[in-house]
């Protein structure tokens, strides 16, 4: 069973998607349509902008989404998912690629999500940190006992958990987790506390947009971040997409569930190979690859 996985924020690089634009007429048309929908030339920033420009949430999220969904489209018959999942933002890419969301609706939602998240970040200074070398329970326990808002945000792979919270909370958590034996507690260069209760304002804003968007049944089950289970029912998919903004990305469990349900290979669709590395940390033996255009 072929599993397809779609990356989230952090996978971006200048030059991403340029080969697609140059090699495929279909890709060119979709990129130009995206420039129109967004109201700015995102292709200029993706292909030849600065890291600084590309790193803004409102650019990064649509950029990664576009790279993933346009690549899946251009692959045509070579893209036949039997199960799919996306990390955070990647969940939207997975849904478009699996036919549950139209390209236009997906892009509108991703742009709305990015803007809502950027606004929520400006309300209260907040951040995230990667905690390496501790078990999930220890990290959960330390976060739970702090008075500031700090929560597990991304369960990336065994021994790698990203936490999210107020700046004071993250500082306190990093100190306590280092004392508890973490190999590293690394503050991340992100705009804010994604996947935490601090994103509540963004969740409310996005809920309105998602409720009014048509979601169809996908061609294959989508394993969603919020509980790592497979879904095909459009109403449940919507509910989970809304919950995702303030809840954790359960990536370790997602990979485990896909393996239990018969995944024999994982293909990453989009920029970078971060997710392949995370899959290997769950199961060293399973084959992983990046989706590429035929030569």
Pin down the residues of each PLM region.
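Alpha/beta catalytic cores of group-transfer enzymes, especially the acyltransferase/condensing modules
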Residues: 9-11, 38, 98-247
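A short, acidic, amphipathic alpha-helical segment used as a generic capping/interface helix at domain edges
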Residues: 248-263
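Non-catalytic positions within long, well-ordered alpha-helices that form the structural scaffold/packing
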Residues: 76, 178, 259-262
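FabD-like malonyl-/acyl-CoA
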Residues: 1-138, 184, 188, 265-294
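Charged catalytic carboxylate motif
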Residues: 26, 67, 169, 205, ...
């Amino acid at each position: 069973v072929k599993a397809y996985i779609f990356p989230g924020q952090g996978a971006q690089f200048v030059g991403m998607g340029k080969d697609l634009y140059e090699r495929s007429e279909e890709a060119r048309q979709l990129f130009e349509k995206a420039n129109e929908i967004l109201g700015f030339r995102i292709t200029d920033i993706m292909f030849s902008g600065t890291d600084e420009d590309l790193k803004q949430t409102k650019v990064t999220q649509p950029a990664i989404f576009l790279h993933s969904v346009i690549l899946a489209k251009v692959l045509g018959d070579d893209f036949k998912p039997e199960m799919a999942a996306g990390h955070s933002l990647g969940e939207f890419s997975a849904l478009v690629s699996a036919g549950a969301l139209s390209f236009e609706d997906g892009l509108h939602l991703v742009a709305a999500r990015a803007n809502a998240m950027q606004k929520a970040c400006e309300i209260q200074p907040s951040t995230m940190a990667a905690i390496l070398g501790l078990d999930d329970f220890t990290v959960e326990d330390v976060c739970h006992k702090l008075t500031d808002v700090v929560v597990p945000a991304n369960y990336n792979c065994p021994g790698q958990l990203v936490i999210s919270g107020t700046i004071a909370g993250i500082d306190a958590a990093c100190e306590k987790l280092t004392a508890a034996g973490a190999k590293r507690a690394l503050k991340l260069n992100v705009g804010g506390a994604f996947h935490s209760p601090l994103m509540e304002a963004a969740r409310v804003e996005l809920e309105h947009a998602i409720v009014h968007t048509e979601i169809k049944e996908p061609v294959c089950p989508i394993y969603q971040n919020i509980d790592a289970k497979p879904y095909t029912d459009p109403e449940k998919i919507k509910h989970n997409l809304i919950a995702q903004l303030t809840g954790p990305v359960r990536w370790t469990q997602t990979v485990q569930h896909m393996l239990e349900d018969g995944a024999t290979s994982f293909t990453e669709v989009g920029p970078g190979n971060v997710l392949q590395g995370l899959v290997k940390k769950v199961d060293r033996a399973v084959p992983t690859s990046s989706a590429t255009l035929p030569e």
